[in-house]
Amino acid sequence: DPCQVKNFEQAIQENTKLIFIETLGNPNSNIIDIAAVAQIAHAHKIPLIIDNTFGTPYLIRPIEHGADIVIHSATKFIGGHGTSLGGVIIDSGNFDWKASGKFPQLTEPDPCYHGIRFCDVAGNASYIIRIRAILLRDTGAAISPFNAFLLLQGLETLSLRVERHVANALQVVDYLSKHPKVEAVHHPSLPQHPDNKLYKRYFPKGGGSIFTIDIKGGIKEAQRFIDSLEIFSLLANV
């Protein structure tokens, strides 16, 4: 259970290289105490990597709470229109990869890049520099110029869109939480959500626009509900 911070401490072994969490969990928008998990990670000299796709840079900035690396699927809220594929890796530059002693690919000579030691060349930025120098070259995971343009264009309206997403979600959540045919609604803004206290601490601008519901009557009623939707679409992606 990732919501119990002590479980991270107990799960760490000698070969553990990192801790990975989400700012808002999929699908029930669970929230983990980022600062507490960051403290555990750093005590064991491993980085905390956070997926902030659902949280978005507008609602929360994980690096300010102790995250070392933040990733996004930019296809979702950053792009905002479902038109382009892309991802983002943000390195805080705060983690000391050399002192960790767990990352020989950063501290030992790299034979495929002239024998350099990335930690000696780039210091705390060695992780992100190696991604650009080695992984980007070897895998070809370079975004197309037009997709990059669309994502940059999406960033211009991110705050306005997410603000409206959150406002709309809260209205729907409020309505559904009172509906007689709904068993439960899962969104951190609700007092009954198990992570409501963390929501108030980490998400002053709102806890995102993703929520789930439990329909009374089981799977058949849930299917009937989905088939009856007129405004919302049934999709495999966010």
Predicted regions: what is each one?
Residues 1-179:
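Conserved PLP-enzyme active-site core in the AAT-like
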Residues 181-238:
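Conserved C-terminal alpha-helix-loop-beta "cap" of PLP-dependent enzymes
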